[in-house]
């Protein structure tokens, strides 16, 4: 019975590690697109994707003036 709880706890930890890795990867993609991760984009910015982090879900970039 103890081994069941140990395996269950290990699976929960692994799930959290993979989520963190994905969030870091998305933040790097946002940086490559010359954006930044924010909780909300400002009025003069456009949403170009998602960072999927808890505190900064949006990838924002300044609008280009034509």
UniProtKB/Swiss-Prot annotation:
Keyword Iron: no
Entry keyword Signal: yes
A Gene Ontology biological process term: defense response to bacterium
Domain of life: Eukaryota
Keywords attached to this entry: Antibiotic, Antimicrobial, Defensin, Disulfide bond, Secreted, Signal
UniProt-listed InterPro entries: Beta_defensin_dom (IPR025933)
Protein name from the UniProt record: Beta-defensin 107A
Species the sequence originates in: Pongo pygmaeus (Bornean orangutan)
Gene name per UniProt: DEFB107A
């Amino acid at each position: 019975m103890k081994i069941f709880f140990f395996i269950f706890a290990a699976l929960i930890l692994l799930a959290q590690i993979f989520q963190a890795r994905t969030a870091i990867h998305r933040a790097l993609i946002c940086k490559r697109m010359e954006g930044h991760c924010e909780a909300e984009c400002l009025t003069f910015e456009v949403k170009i994707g998602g960072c999927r982090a808890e505190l900064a879900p949006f990838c924002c970039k300044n609008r280009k003036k034509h």
